[in-house]
Amino acid sequence: MMFLKRYIFFLLCMPCLAQAKNITISRLTCEMQEGLVLVEAYPRLGWTMESPENGTRQTAYEIEIREACTGRTVWNTGKVQSSQSQLIPTHGAKFLRFSFYNYIWRVRVWDETDAPSEWSREAKFRLVPQGFSSAEWIG
């Protein structure tokens, strides 16, 4: 009976063990800038992974992009095996054809033990027409 109780306790604790060890995602960037960024084409996204433990490294990531106004997910990379965390291209995203749309994105990463982090906070970018970001006030 004691063995059965320990076994059940172990099974209940398993989901807690699968979480990555105190990994946090910070400094979300779009074209190497933080905050709401205006982009004319496919944005390149980035982030910084932080962990209090030495030797922790990113082995994979997943990016999700949603429309800010509806919350509808318009692009998700799925789990991508990569240690890259800067200037990640979104050139495969077919949603990026609507000018003046605000998009929200977030990311999560996997560590060397294949445990996922929590999703990052959300960051924004806005798609603008070609040449708009270099426009000047004529008044």
Put a short name on every predicted segment.
Residues M2-F3, P15:
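Position-driven detector of the extreme protein N-terminus
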Residues F3-F10:
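Sec-dependent signal peptide recognition
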Residues F10-Q19:
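Hydrophobic h-region of N-terminal signal peptides that target proteins for export
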Residues K21-E53, R126-S133:
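Pro/Thr/Ser/Gly-rich low-complexity, intrinsically disordered linker/stalk tracts
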Residues G46-T48, E64, R108:
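Residue-level recognition of well-ordered beta-strand positions that form the cores
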Residues T56-N102, E112-W119, A135-G139:
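Recognizes extended acidic, P/S/T-rich segments that occur
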Residues S120-K124:
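Terminal edge beta-strands and adjacent linker/stalk segments
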